[in-house]
A protein has these predicted regions:
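N-terminal prepro-regions of secreted/extracellular proteins
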Residues: 1-73
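Short, surface-exposed binding/anchoring microloops in extracellular/periplasmic proteins
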Residues: 61-101
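Solvent-exposed serine/threonine-rich low-complexity stretches and specific carbohydrate-binding patches
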Residues: 110-123
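Exposed aromatic-hydrophobic patches
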Residues: 125-133
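Hydrophobic/tyrosine-rich beta-strand signature of extracellular beta-sandwich/beta-rich modules
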Residues: 142-144
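Short beta-strand elements
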Residues: 151-167
Length: 167
């Protein structure tokens, strides 16, 4: 029975080494992603900040669309907080807020991860706020599409945050 004991010890050692190697690999991937801190992808700076906001401010001659905002927060544990709003100067027939959650590994473009479309009628604003669980090891950002429609006239604009690292 002594041979068996030796085998078990070897297996145990191998498993321990394997586990160690795997965890080191995970750390490496994270380090690689963090190597891209400070770079800009598609207009968004890659940051390790806990939150980032983006704003669309209407041009002076705009009649209906006042402003649009998006904000992303790192809530810890792989959760991000998502906030968005579209505000019109007056009550409009249709008020829209589309929020796009996008992610990048720092090495490539931002890709669509999740999206929400919000619409309200005969009002002057629409907001959304939620918390979602995301995959760790990526930079996440929000893009907002904001529009106010009245009497057949549409005014719209876009907003975007920087990328925040979720690890």
């Amino acid at each position: 029975g002594s041979m068996k004991k030796v085998m078990n010890l070897k297996n145990l050692l191998f498993c321990a080494l394997f586990a160690l190697t795997m965890s080191l690999n995970a750390v490496n991937v994270q380090a690689e992603t963090l190597d891209y801190l400070g770079q800009t992808i598609d207009g968004s700076i890659l940051t390790d900040k806990l939150e980032s906001s983006g704003e669309y401010l209407s041009v002076a001659r705009s009649t209906y669309l006042h402003q649009g905002t998006v904000r992303i927060t790192n809530n810890g544990g792989g959760y991000v907080g998502i906030f968005g709003g579209t505000e019109c100067n007056v009550s409009c027939n249709t008020v829209k807020l589309n929020v796009y959650l996008e992610r990048s590994n720092g090495n490539g473009n931002f890709y669509s991860y999740q999206k929400w479309e919000n619409v309200e009628y005969n009002t002057n604003s629409v907001y959304m706020s939620k918390q979602v669980k995301v995959e760790k090891g990526y930079y996440y950002r929000l893009r907002g599409y904001h529009s106010c429609t009245k009497n057949g006239v549409i005014e719209n604009g876009g907003s975007v945050t920087d990328g925040i690292y979720i690890g």
